[in-house]
């Protein structure tokens, strides 16, 4: 080995043993230390435009009312959207409606009611499908924990509140491109996120869930809270559960939501109204009632005809409660029947009471609530 080679080896060995001269180290990127930029912030002195009518109702203190759509026909959706609701609750938890069908609804009739949806569960795919296609109200069912609630927040909101993606070519651009202030800049101030408390675990976690930034309302799911508790309306145990959910929302400064038939309970300020099917039946029943009263009093359409005022109400009860597919519609029909019976003759009132008793006997799972609703309306069902 010559002298030059030996010198090189000694130099290399020295570098290994005592370390080579240090270069300036580059710190590893740490996302937690990153400060979010100003690109989407409002200028000093500016406030975000509220273009979502549902959010405007909540900011004004409510009530915010959403009509429910289960059908897949855009004409039916458009009729509901024009009926005066603040938003439309498209049902996708318990229906086989596709996102393509829902997108057609919203593109055809983006208003006057804000487009909304109850998704099937709290995950990125479900919620971003909804928001990317134009939903401005997101209802998420069966939230049992703070972690599940945070998932719903994450996929509903853009950063820095959530983790919603801002990919290009989203369907909502056809609906919301022209909103004042810009969609991306004002979305976090306009979207309404409602989380449904449906189980005992959800009730236990309700107070912590309600405190999460981004949650606008807790929905006390009247049917499933009875399903999971084994109690019904009027039972002390059931009412305590409902009160716990409403109190959790109130203490956190957000809204407590419920079926519209609870509109007389002051703790609730946002509501789910009946389905399009129930509204069609009610509209038809009202029209037929008017015809029956006219023909019965004037003899039109048949001399000497007499009309029973119970007919349309009985038909609605039968349609909604003989084979229950949506509890809220049946309960609403019972409530309407009890109210209608107050102005009927004794014989017609007896017909209504008898039919409700038959339906109570035929639906043991809903019997307690049906009986409670009827009794609260002054209808004797035994």
Where are these regions (language model features)?
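Bacterial N-terminal signal peptides that target proteins for export
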Residues: 1-9
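Bacterial N-terminal signal peptides
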Residues: 9-19
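Sec/Tat signal peptide C-region and signal peptidase I cleavage site
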Residues: 20-26
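Expand to "…catalyze enediolate/carbanion chemistry for C-C bond making/breaking, isomerization
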Residues: 28-308
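General marker for long, soluble alpha-helical cores
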Residues: 301-382
